[in-house]
Design a protein with these regions (language model features):
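Flexible "arm" and connector segments at domain edges
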Residues: 1-65, 71-161
Length: 161
């Protein structure tokens, strides 16, 4: 490829993959549920790539694996948009708003804390945000964390064989 692809180009690629008539047969039938194992798998590969970067200094694997994680975010967002739930722009907006809220020492007049204090402040802000979340959401989150742990164990076992 001779030209640099932009983020909008990438979004267009994902839309084309999901096109009901011309898209990829595999991508067209994916759902939020069917992609859950892929999301876990790609995150574990990204974590492994971070370890590899630390060990070797070679960034190529991390760059590739972050692209795979990005695919999961954009593909899940595309499916949600098709279902009328939310769009990738909504995901980006909400993620940005969260960063603004959780970094008042950067984005408001609040004094900058010592770096050791930041995780505690982050957690306090997160807990305040959680007040509106349901117990069902928290239960589902714990189930997802357990599924992710099982996938990591499976990958480690496969790697050691």
């Amino acid at each position: 490829m001779d030209r640099m692809l932009t983020f909008d180009d990438y979004r267009g690629i994902i839309r084309a993959l999901r096109d009901p008539e011309k898209g990829c047969p595999w991508d067209r039938v994916q759902t939020h549920e069917s992609l859950k194992p892929c999301m876990i798998h790609e995150m574990t590969e990204a974590v492994a790539a971070v370890d590899l970067l630390s060990e070797t200094g070679d960034p190529d694997n991390l760059c590739e694996e972050l692209g795979d994680v990005l695919l999961q975010v954009v593909l899940q967002s595309q499916i949600a948009e098709e279902e009328g739930l939310f769009s990738l722009d909504d995901v980006i907006r909400r993620a940005g708003e969260k960063m603004l809220r959780r970094h008042p020492h950067v984005f408001s007049s609040e004094a900058s804390p010592e770096k050791e204090e930041i995780p505690g402040r982050w957690e306090a802000i997160k807990q305040a945000e959680k007040q509106g979340k349901s117990a069902e959401y928290e239960r589902k989150k714990k189930e997802a964390e357990a599924a992710a742990a099982r996938e990591v164990i499976r990958l480690l076992n496969a790697e050691n064989q």
